[in-house]
A protein has these predicted regions:
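A conserved beta-strand-loop-helix scaffold within acyl/acetyltransferase catalytic domains
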Residues: 3-68, 114-244
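Glycine-rich, often proline-containing surface loops adjacent to acidic residues and nearby aromatics
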Residues: 76-77, 107-110, 141
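Conserved acyl-CoA
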Residues: 92-108
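A short, internal acetyl-CoA/4′-phosphopantetheine-binding micro-motif in the GNAT/acyltransferase core
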Residues: 76-88, 244
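N-terminal, well-ordered alpha-helical segments
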Residues: 46-48, 58, 78, 96, ...
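Conserved acyl-donor/pantetheine-binding loop and adjacent beta-alpha core of acyl/acetyltransferases
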Residues: 66-79
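Conserved GNAT acetyl-CoA-binding A-motif
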Residues: 105-117
Length: 244
């Protein structure tokens, strides 16, 4: 087993962290510090860098959550981020070491939400295999679906009728920065379900300013009035509709 060091993240490590995430097998832009730190006031950061032979070989975005740590409730997903050439055995060693590290720091459990392999640069599930071998317990499984670039296949009759209705009413699709209109529409829709937006409008604008190429806002306008919209995350391998 390689000698591994587990170092608590500090702001002076931002560049090293981001460089590793950018070249990792499964890291994405939401694991960059520019994204993670936009709501740093909400979370007690417990992120860790894994070091071997003076090199970063893994990073673990995490925050304190009660008596444990989570990776990561402030992101769509978290988990151990590791290099392209690393073997499954090393990923297991890193996760086992992280468990010991957090236990020695007084934490009692780790809640782990893995990066779906559709977002990996080089898809692999070494971490899921390692978690099983370490007797991790599955507590939740989320539903997701992917539409390939060549289309979803057969389009339902209901969607076809909706498309024709939009065309008759001269609905126009636009990309832009109409965040105030979008946020008002979003809040209105969520109120019907007794819910509120996860992000504030200030946070949406801050993320757009920090990572302008990663966020796209599309709207459907009828007579210049916004009637529907989606806020899209642009990952390296896929587009994700955060709000629709």
């Amino acid at each position: 087993m390689r000698l591994l060091q587990f170092i608590h993240y500090s702001p002076d490590m931002e560049d090293d962290w981001d460089r590793f995430v950018a070249k990792s097998r499964n890291g994405t832009f939401i694991h960059s510090r520019a994204f993670m730190d936009y709501h740093s006031d909400r979370f007690d950061d417990q992120s860790v860098l894994v070091i071997s032979n003076d090199e970063i070989i893994g990073v673990f975005p995490a925050h304190a959550m009660g008596s444990g740590v989570a990776s990561h409730n402030g992101l769509t997903f978290g988990g151990i981020l590791y290099g392209i050439d690393q073997r499954a055995s090393l990923v297991r060693d890193m996760l086992a070491g992280l468990s010991d590290h957090f236990t020695s720091s007084g934490f009692k459990k780790i809640t782990y939400k893995a990066v779906p392999h559709i977002f990996h640069r080089y898809p692999a599930e070494d971490d899921l295999f390692a978690l099983q071998s370490l007797n991790a317990k599955l507590i939740r499984r989320d539903l997701s679906a992917v539409i390939p670039p060549n289309g979803p296949g057969k389009v339902s009759a209901l969607r076809k009728r909706g498309q024709k209705k939009a065309q008759r009413n001269n609905v126009v699709i636009r990309e832009g920065d109409f965040y105030e209109e979008f946020y008002a529409l979003l809040a209105h829709v969520l109120r019907k379900h007794n819910a509120t937006p996860i992000h504030s409008i200030a946070e949406l604008k801050l993320l757009k300013k920090r990572l302008p190429e990663r966020f796209k806002l599309f709207g459907a306008f009828e007579n210049d009035e916004l009637t529907a919209a989606t806020w899209v995350f642009r990952f390296d391998t896929a587009l994700h509709t955060q709000y629709l």
